[in-house]
Amino acid sequence: MLAGCSFSSSRHQMSTAQRFDILPCGFSKRGSRGDGAAPRVAGDARSGATTCSFRTHPAPPVTQSVSWGAKPEPGGNGNGAHRAVKRAHDEDAVEEYGPIVRAKRTRMGGDGDEVWFHQSIAGTMQATAAGEGEEAEEEKVFLVPSAAAFPHGMAAAGPSLAAAKKEEYSKSPSDSSSSSGTDGGSSAMMPPPQPPEFDARNGVPAPGQAEREALELVRALTACADSLSAGNHEAANYYLARLGEMASPAGPTPMHRVAAYFTEALALRVVRMWPHMFDIGPPRELTDDAFGGGDDDAMALRILNAITPIPRFLHFTLNERLLREFEGHERVHVIDFDIKQGLQWPGLLQSLAARAVPPAHVRITGVGESRQELQETGARLARVAAALGLAFEFHAVVDRLEDVRLWMLHVKRGECVAVNCVLAMHRLLRDDAALTDFLGLARSTGATILLLGEHEGGGLNSGRWEARFARALRYYAAAFDAVDAAGLPEASPARAKAEEMFAREIRNAVAFEGPERFERHESFAGWRRRMEDGGGFKNAGIGEREAMQGRMIARMFGPDKYTVQAHGGGGSGGGEALTLRWLDQPLYTVTAWTPAGDGAGGSTVSASTTASHSQQS
């Protein structure tokens, strides 16, 4: 996490330069400062006595040093948690390559598993109250302004925020916690926070306090987003400070933890919205997710594979569809455009080897940006294939998804080719031309089928930022609840590692815009429109076998929480798509597509495709 840091206007030498502090321990207690000023509500016609919560430098701005290293634990070197996670999951690595087994789990002690939301920004967000739990003392680390320390009583020069909110409530009895933020009106403020309740015996939050804080966190997040939409940096600063006091990646409920990462993303967005006021140099992992994931993403994916059905649902369901496509073919070729650690393919190799007549040759082409990771994945898959007695070949392509060309893929005559895209194609939605080119590349391989596994975004790709923020909060709150349901201990480094993978998605989806925002999740209906209207593909359907596989995996991890929904099909059979849901929230959808108008059926690669490869080679 972030260590102590401050940043100032080093490029813009202005007398109005502001400072944004990031401290490793949250914020000072409300009673410790008496000079905090309540933020001015956007459009407020009251007196200008209210001071700006972004403090002005008393002296000319000076470039300040920044330290982003994580604060080590007392008496340790800070690497213990990483080693503990690695040991725990290296022992279980063989499970990822074997048959599906029932995961051993325990349930959390609390009884508050469901998440309920109330109406909020643009009528799309709902507040949540998560389960009970006692919050231990922990160090809170957030990208939030430490200068925004407000006294508990919220006393300040001029009209206080509490008084303003009281007047607002007296005018409108409805419990509205946000506004559209686009009409120039005031940004909605949440009710004055109440003093936290503590158990006198051990100093931890009293029973029920965690649920109340979870509800307040949702209100603060939506109000902060509303303030950003209204251009009110003073109110946004206040809410970021308030969120920093309550939210924590080690919090007692999933809402505390997901709110911590949304707070960080909102703070990054503040910096990007007012670059003339603030200057920050965060580490590359905060701004470049492709660089910052690395080994952390690899380990997080393995952990997620062990504690949730998400990777297994995507991989095994698509593998069942792929096996049906490869039936009767002697030479098969899978092109995986984001292979990562190759967790999907040992199961496929086992199924192919178990056939009465296994294929004579199996080729997997893996695309990725890390040469070392691709080499390790290829060696691991080669060992699995050798143990199964399969003739196997792995081909690595080191390049970005949008830069791959046909000649790099080594497609050969006589192969039955399948294209696999799991959690990869959504990164192309930032550029329609790039997506069109990629679909053209997929068709040019002569593939008989394109397998697609993606987030069921439901509007996270387009629309107003406020609405996208609300949908993202609902989506990732459900994802954190799903991780929490695995029953890992509250201080588990494995759980933290899995949640940090979602945090990188949150950071990009909330803080960035334009070409820099590549976490653009689309719904199944949106993907169908893109694939069929100009993409050159038609839906190939998901069969009953695939549907049974997906439902079996969901039942393994939580029959009362996870469900699998078929689109365009009835009964227990398949349809056009399958969606994995957590309670009422869709999470991930798998689909299969075949080139439209392929009269020959696409069973073999055309002579022109082979000739193109030969010329380039």
Swiss-Prot record:
Cellular compartment(s): Nucleus
Low complexity: compositionally biased ranges: 171-187, 603-617
UniProt key word Cell cycle: no
Lineage top rank: taxon: Eukaryota
Region entry Disordered, spans: 29-92, 159-206, 596-617
Name the UniProt record assigns to this protein: Protein DWARF AND LOW-TILLERING
Keywords recorded for this protein, A-Z: Brassinosteroid signaling pathway, Nucleus, Transcription, Transcription regulation
PROSITE patterns named among the record's database cross-references: GRAS (PS50985)
Region described as SAW: spans on this chain: 511-594
Segments of this protein annotated with the region Leucine repeat II (LRII): 376-408
InterPro entries listed in its UniProt record: TF_GRAS
Residue span, GRAS domain: 208-594
Region (PFYRE): 417-508
GO molecular function, one term: DNA-binding transcription factor activity
Job description of the protein: Probable transcription factor that acts as a positive regulator of brassinosteroid (BR) signaling. Functions downstream of BRI1 and GSK2 to modulate BR responses. Acts as a direct target of GSK2 kinase to mediate BR responses. Involved in feedback inhibition of BR biosynthetic genes. Repressed by BZR1. Cooperatively functions in a transactivating complex with SMOS1 to enhance the transcription of the SMOS1 target PHI-1, and regulate plant organ size. Interaction between SMOS1 and DLT is a crosstalk point for auxin and brassinosteroid signaling.
Annotated GO CC locations: nucleus
Tissue: Expressed in the shoot apical meristem (SAM) and elongating cells of young seedlings. Expressed in leaf joints, culms, internodes, stems, young panicles, primary roots and lateral roots.
Region (Leucine repeat I (LRI)): 215-295
PTM comment text: Phosphorylated on serine and threonine residues by GSK2. Dephosphorylated during response to brassinosteroid.
Keyword Transcription: yes
Induction: Down-regulated by 24-epibrassinolide.
Renumbered residue ranges of the record's region VHIID: 301-366
Family: Belongs to the GRAS family.
Subunit note: Interacts with GSK2. Interacts with SMOS1 (via C-terminus).
Chain positions of motif VHIID: 332-336
Main location (coarse class): nucleus
